[in-house]
Amino acid sequence: LICLSGKKITYDSLVVCPGIQLDWNKIEGLKDNLGKNDVSCNYSYESAPYTWEMIKNMKKGTAVFTNPSSPIKCGGAPHKIMYLACDYWQKQGVLDQIKVHYVSGAGVIFGVKEYAETLKGMLEKYKIITHFQSDTYKIDGEGKTLYFRTKLNKDQLAENFKSSN
Protein backbone atom coordinates (compact mmCIF):
# COMPACT_ATOMS: atom_id res chain seq x y z
CA LEU A 1 0.00 0.00 0.00
CA ILE A 2 1.26 3.47 -0.72
CA CYS A 3 -0.72 6.15 1.13
CA LEU A 4 -0.85 9.75 -0.02
CA SER A 5 1.43 10.44 2.94
CA GLY A 6 4.01 8.15 1.33
CA LYS A 7 3.75 5.36 3.91
CA LYS A 8 4.28 1.95 2.24
CA ILE A 9 3.00 -1.51 3.21
CA THR A 10 3.95 -4.57 1.12
CA TYR A 11 2.50 -8.07 0.63
CA ASP A 12 3.43 -11.33 -1.06
CA SER A 13 0.10 -12.85 -2.10
CA LEU A 14 -3.25 -11.35 -2.96
CA VAL A 15 -6.66 -13.05 -3.01
CA VAL A 16 -9.29 -10.89 -4.72
CA CYS A 17 -13.08 -11.22 -4.41
CA PRO A 18 -14.45 -8.94 -7.19
CA GLY A 19 -18.24 -9.17 -6.64
CA ILE A 20 -21.42 -11.13 -7.39
CA GLN A 21 -21.36 -10.95 -11.21
CA LEU A 22 -17.75 -11.98 -11.62
CA ASP A 23 -16.86 -8.89 -13.60
CA TRP A 24 -13.12 -9.52 -13.97
CA ASN A 25 -12.78 -6.19 -15.81
CA LYS A 26 -14.12 -4.14 -12.88
CA ILE A 27 -10.64 -4.19 -11.36
CA GLU A 28 -8.00 -3.07 -13.86
CA GLY A 29 -5.45 -5.84 -14.40
CA LEU A 30 -7.38 -8.58 -12.56
CA LYS A 31 -8.40 -10.56 -15.64
CA ASP A 32 -4.83 -10.60 -16.98
CA ASN A 33 -3.32 -11.70 -13.66
CA LEU A 34 -5.93 -14.13 -12.34
CA GLY A 35 -4.28 -17.45 -11.57
CA LYS A 36 -0.73 -16.14 -11.91
CA ASN A 37 1.59 -13.50 -10.46
CA ASP A 38 0.39 -14.47 -6.96
CA VAL A 39 -3.16 -13.25 -7.71
CA SER A 40 -6.15 -15.54 -7.21
CA CYS A 41 -9.89 -15.56 -6.58
CA ASN A 42 -11.93 -18.32 -5.00
CA TYR A 43 -14.91 -17.35 -7.17
CA SER A 44 -12.99 -18.58 -10.23
CA TYR A 45 -13.17 -22.34 -10.63
CA GLU A 46 -9.91 -22.23 -12.55
CA SER A 47 -7.92 -20.16 -10.05
CA ALA A 48 -9.33 -21.40 -6.72
CA PRO A 49 -6.79 -24.27 -6.52
CA TYR A 50 -4.05 -21.66 -7.07
CA THR A 51 -5.24 -19.90 -3.90
CA TRP A 52 -4.43 -22.99 -1.87
CA GLU A 53 -1.04 -23.39 -3.60
CA MET A 54 -0.17 -19.79 -2.68
CA ILE A 55 -1.21 -20.41 0.93
CA LYS A 56 0.76 -23.66 1.21
CA ASN A 57 3.89 -22.14 -0.31
CA MET A 58 3.91 -18.93 1.71
CA LYS A 59 6.42 -18.92 4.56
CA LYS A 60 6.91 -15.19 5.15
CA GLY A 61 5.90 -11.81 3.77
CA THR A 62 2.50 -10.17 3.41
CA ALA A 63 -0.85 -11.56 2.28
CA VAL A 64 -3.80 -9.37 1.32
CA PHE A 65 -7.39 -10.59 1.19
CA THR A 66 -10.07 -8.37 -0.34
CA ASN A 67 -13.83 -8.02 -0.06
CA PRO A 68 -15.61 -5.50 -2.36
CA SER A 69 -18.27 -3.00 -1.37
CA SER A 70 -20.51 -4.43 -4.10
CA PRO A 71 -22.76 -7.42 -3.32
CA ILE A 72 -21.02 -10.81 -3.45
CA LYS A 73 -22.21 -14.41 -3.74
CA CYS A 74 -21.33 -15.28 -0.14
CA GLY A 75 -20.56 -12.60 2.42
CA GLY A 76 -18.49 -15.02 4.44
CA ALA A 77 -16.29 -16.32 1.60
CA PRO A 78 -13.55 -13.67 1.84
CA HIS A 79 -13.43 -14.28 5.60
CA LYS A 80 -13.33 -18.05 5.33
CA ILE A 81 -10.26 -18.26 3.10
CA MET A 82 -8.44 -15.62 5.15
CA TYR A 83 -9.05 -17.40 8.47
CA LEU A 84 -8.27 -20.80 6.92
CA ALA A 85 -4.99 -19.40 5.61
CA CYS A 86 -4.11 -17.87 8.98
CA ASP A 87 -4.94 -21.11 10.77
CA TYR A 88 -2.81 -23.08 8.33
CA TRP A 89 0.11 -20.66 8.69
CA GLN A 90 -0.23 -20.80 12.48
CA LYS A 91 -0.12 -24.61 12.45
CA GLN A 92 2.94 -24.47 10.17
CA GLY A 93 4.63 -22.09 12.62
CA VAL A 94 4.99 -19.28 10.07
CA LEU A 95 2.09 -16.93 10.90
CA ASP A 96 4.41 -14.65 12.88
CA GLN A 97 6.42 -14.19 9.66
CA ILE A 98 3.35 -13.16 7.62
CA LYS A 99 1.60 -9.81 7.77
CA VAL A 100 -2.07 -10.28 6.86
CA HIS A 101 -4.19 -7.42 5.51
CA TYR A 102 -7.95 -7.42 4.98
CA VAL A 103 -9.17 -4.78 2.49
CA SER A 104 -12.96 -4.47 2.67
CA GLY A 105 -15.50 -2.16 1.09
CA ALA A 106 -17.69 -2.66 4.14
CA GLY A 107 -17.56 -0.37 7.15
CA VAL A 108 -17.46 -3.24 9.65
CA ILE A 109 -16.02 -6.74 9.78
CA PHE A 110 -19.45 -8.36 9.22
CA GLY A 111 -22.98 -7.01 8.93
CA VAL A 112 -24.54 -9.46 11.40
CA LYS A 113 -23.74 -8.23 14.91
CA GLU A 114 -23.71 -11.68 16.51
CA TYR A 115 -21.06 -12.91 14.06
CA ALA A 116 -19.13 -9.65 14.03
CA GLU A 117 -18.04 -10.03 17.66
CA THR A 118 -16.62 -13.49 17.00
CA LEU A 119 -14.88 -12.30 13.84
CA LYS A 120 -13.32 -9.37 15.69
CA GLY A 121 -11.74 -11.97 17.95
CA MET A 122 -10.34 -13.76 14.90
CA LEU A 123 -8.83 -10.50 13.62
CA GLU A 124 -7.11 -10.03 16.97
CA LYS A 125 -6.01 -13.66 17.25
CA TYR A 126 -4.30 -13.60 13.85
CA LYS A 127 -3.20 -9.93 14.10
CA ILE A 128 -4.96 -9.08 10.83
CA ILE A 129 -4.59 -5.46 9.71
CA THR A 130 -7.93 -4.10 8.49
CA HIS A 131 -8.70 -1.47 5.86
CA PHE A 132 -12.47 -0.87 5.97
CA GLN A 133 -14.45 1.15 3.43
CA SER A 134 -11.74 0.44 0.88
CA ASP A 135 -12.12 -0.93 -2.66
CA THR A 136 -9.52 -2.44 -4.97
CA TYR A 137 -9.46 -0.72 -8.35
CA LYS A 138 -6.22 -1.91 -10.00
CA ILE A 139 -3.72 -4.77 -9.93
CA ASP A 140 -0.26 -4.65 -11.47
CA GLY A 141 0.67 -8.33 -11.43
CA GLU A 142 4.14 -8.01 -12.93
CA GLY A 143 4.91 -5.11 -10.58
CA LYS A 144 3.24 -7.09 -7.77
CA THR A 145 1.14 -4.10 -6.68
CA LEU A 146 -2.51 -3.75 -5.62
CA TYR A 147 -4.19 -0.34 -5.65
CA PHE A 148 -7.25 0.56 -3.60
CA ARG A 149 -9.20 3.62 -2.57
CA THR A 150 -10.52 4.25 0.88
CA LYS A 151 -13.75 6.12 1.53
CA LEU A 152 -12.61 7.15 5.01
CA ASN A 153 -9.85 9.55 4.02
CA LYS A 154 -9.88 9.47 0.19
CA ASP A 155 -6.31 8.13 0.14
CA GLN A 156 -5.34 6.02 -2.83
CA LEU A 157 -3.25 3.16 -1.55
CA ALA A 158 -1.01 0.59 -3.18
CA GLU A 159 0.23 -2.68 -1.71
CA ASN A 160 3.33 -4.41 -3.05
CA PHE A 161 3.14 -8.20 -2.97
CA LYS A 162 6.58 -9.31 -4.08
CA SER A 163 7.20 -12.92 -3.16
CA SER A 164 9.70 -13.53 -0.39
CA ASN A 165 9.04 -17.19 0.39
Task: Annotate each PLM feature.
Residues 2-8:
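Short, well-structured alpha-helical segments in soluble
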Residues 23-110, 159, 165:
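Rossmann-like dinucleotide/flavin-binding elements
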Residues 10-21, 159-165:
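Short hydrophobic core segments
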Residues 1-2, 90-165:
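A Rossmann-like FAD-binding core segment of flavoenzymes
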Residues 9, 22, 61, 137, ...:
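Glycine-centered loop/turn positions within well-structured domains
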Residues 5, 18-19, 67, 150:
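Glycine-rich, N-terminal phosphate-binding loop of Rossmann-like dinucleotide-binding domains
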